[in-house]
Every structure is written in structure tokens, then in C-alpha cells.
Curated annotation (Swiss-Prot):
This is Unknown protein 10.
């Protein structure tokens, strides 16, 4: 639920690219 944090470190959090469209 932390979008801001996901954008900062998506790889660390475990986001495949949902928050980071790059």
C-alpha cells in the first residue's frame, strides 16, 4: 500500500513493475 516507497526501491520491496512502469 506504499506506492511512494515502491517507486524508490521496487526491487528491494519486491515489485515486478506495478508501481514502476519503467
Amino acid at each position: 500500500a506504499r506506492t511512494g516507497f515502491g517507486v524508490l526501491k521496487p526491487a528491494m520491496q519486491g515489485y515486478p513493475g506495478l508501481v514502476l512502469p519503467r
